[in-house]
């Protein structure tokens, strides 16, 4: 998120989250008008564009000015504009980037929604008409159409129950967790909304009414407790979120998994589950950690549903303009529900008639509202940029999705029941692994002053290795590469010597013998890997091998347990370097730009 001024007098100030793709053209235009830029940011172009339009038309009102600015912008953005010329007003707008408004009042509001005001179709008053004519004459800048006059009215939402006006405060943010300490009443803006705050009022405008568009924006109560976004006894949010995982996965399963009756109930999918069973293929589309969680469950979906499965990185999916058909099911996985690439891919799939499913952590997010159906992962607020508990909750929810899809397959029932039994035990097994926290911290001392690290896994554990490598790169800034064990001899083995740090995932499963072969190849080249192995495995004697033992569970869930030591390893590597664990450089929690 970036803020910038229009000039040294701060006539206009802009706070901007997103990316303006045509800012170079705007900059070139404004430079011909005599503007001098202080930075290379796209945000500065917005502020100077606002000043240019105001200088040309000093009688323009703030909302009409913002509309004229927005019409010139291409890309995705959430904007706040403030001006010394409109000292009691703030205008906010969003397009492709989240924006939420918190509302705090002393008494209960009369209604729990705000009306959306659309452009008037009738003739314009003389003042407004002349304003629009003047705008149309401005060089190289398009004016809003004549019907775009924005009218002001007092919103009925902010009266108290007895109909009397009352004091009110507004809070604007791209993330509701930043607002919860002030109020739990929030309103989510939709794309192309313009919010105008003035004189203790909030008016929401749209310049045109889309077919089927809602006439109101609901004021919702967010279910976040303040202590959930406080660190408590932990040093960092990431550490807190790692240790919350035994509870967060229980929350993901609560009311959905019945281990006694061996049933799965996913209310958000109930209406569409039979349609999904008949689909031609299932496409998982995600970015970053969410992509790795999709990779981790691909095998269980293929095994239980026998439907072709593909897993796509949203950015690559868009670059290829991959073919999507009406009988496909496209599953979008995102912690925030606002990931820009995933949202663009979602629109691509909707345009082609595919059934869309959202698996998100944030209720009311763009993905949750745009998809046909979905699952809320119930992980709770995740503050640390490096995702931990969202990964395991996504994993669990997608396994339950696969179990629900295969409910009608008689040949799969024994396997389904075994997986459900495994899910019922996973929380206690998490607690067991977390008790090794200090041992893992001590193991990380071996990586002191290292420049690179290798992570090896096979089968479903390749996804675990990918996720572990991402965590280490994100927060410790240590180069880390995840390699499929089967690919070791196809080039990567040349890197192995006694000085290269290597972590190998070698828990017992059907591929253990093949994974062990890779371990022996590393040992033969004088490598001394740290091994993540099954508890009590005699293959790796403690006096000869540095190891982290994890409980044994059913193969499709083993990745849930194996990722916990890697999360802890990433955390302690970053702490040892004195780095900002929660907010690593150059990264953002919600990636709302392409």
Predicted feature residues:
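Active-site phosphate/pyrophosphate-binding segments
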Residues: 245-283, 326, 352, 363, ...
């Amino acid at each position: 998120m970036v803020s910038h001024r229009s000039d040294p007098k701060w006539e206009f100030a802009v706070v901007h989250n997103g990316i303006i793709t045509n800012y170079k053209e705007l900059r070139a235009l404004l430079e011909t008008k005599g503007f001098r830029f202080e930075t290379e940011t796209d945000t500065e172009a917005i502020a100077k564009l606002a000043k240019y339009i105001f200088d040309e038309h000093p009688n323009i009102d703030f909302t009409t000015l913002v509309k004229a600015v927005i019409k010139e912008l291409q890309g995705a953005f959430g904007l706040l504009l403030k001006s010394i010329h409109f000292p009691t007003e703030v205008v906010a707008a969003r397009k492709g980037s989240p924006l939420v408004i918190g509302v705090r009042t002393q008494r209960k509001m009369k209604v729990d929604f705000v009306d959306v005001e659309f452009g008037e179709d009738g003739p314009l008053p003389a003042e407004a008409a002349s304003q629009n004519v003047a705008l149309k004459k401005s060089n190289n800048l398009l004016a809003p159409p004549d019907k775009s006059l924005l009218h002001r009215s007092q919103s009925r939402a902010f009266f108290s129950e007895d109909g009397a006006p009352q004091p009110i405060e507004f809070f604007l943010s791209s993330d509701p967790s930043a607002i919860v300490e002030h109020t739990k009443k929030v309103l989510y803006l939709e794309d192309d909304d313009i919010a105008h705050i003035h004189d203790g009022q909030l008016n929401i405008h749209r310049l045109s009414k889309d077919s089927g568009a809602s006439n109101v924006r609901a004021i919702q109560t967010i279910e976040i407790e303040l202590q959930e976004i406080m660190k408590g006894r932990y040093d960092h949010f990431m550490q807190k979120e790692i240790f919350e995982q035994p509870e967060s996965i229980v929350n993901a399963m609560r009311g959905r998994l019945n281990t006694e009756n061996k049933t799965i109930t996913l209310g958000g999918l109930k209406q569409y589950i039979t349609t999904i069973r008949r689909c031609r293929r299932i496409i998982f589309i995600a970015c970053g950690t969410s992509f790795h969680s999709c990779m981790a469950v691909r095998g269980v979906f293929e095994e239980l549903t026998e439907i072709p499965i593909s897993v796509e990185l949203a950015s690559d999916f868009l670059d290829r303009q991959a073919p999507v058909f009406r009988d496909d099911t496209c599953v979008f996985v995102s912690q925030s529900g606002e990931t820009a690439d995933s949202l663009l891919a979602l629109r691509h799939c909707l345009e082609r008639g595919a059934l869309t499913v959202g698996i998100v952590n944030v209720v009311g997010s763009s993905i949750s509202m745009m998809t046909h159906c979905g699952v809320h992962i119930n992980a709770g607020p995740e503050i640390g940029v490096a995702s931990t508990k969202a990964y395991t909750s996504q994993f669990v929810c997608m396994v339950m999705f696969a179990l629900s899809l295969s409910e009608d397959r008689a040949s799969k029932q024994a396997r389904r029941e075994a997986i459900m039994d495994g899910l019922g035990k996973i929380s206690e097994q998490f607690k067991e692994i977390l008790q090794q926290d200090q041992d893992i911290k001590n193991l990380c001392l071996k990586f002191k002053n290292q420049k690179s690290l290798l992570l090896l896994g096979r089968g479903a554990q390749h996804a675990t290795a990918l996720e572990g490598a991402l965590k280490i790169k994100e927060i410790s800034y240590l180069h880390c590469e995840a390699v499929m064990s089967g690919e070791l001899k196809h080039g990567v083995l040349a890197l192995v010597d006694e000085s290269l740090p290597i972590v190998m995932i070698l828990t017992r499963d059907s591929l253990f013998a093949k994974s062990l072969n890779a371990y022996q190849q590393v040992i033969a080249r004088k490598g001394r890997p740290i091994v993540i192995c099954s508890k009590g495995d005699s293959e790796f004697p403690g006096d000869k091998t540095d190891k982290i033992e994890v409980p044994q569970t059913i193969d499709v869930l083993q990745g849930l347990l194996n990722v916990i030591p890697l999360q802890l390893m990433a955390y302690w590597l970053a702490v040892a370097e004195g780095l900002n664990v929660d907010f690593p450089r150059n990264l953002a929690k919600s990636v709302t730009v392409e």
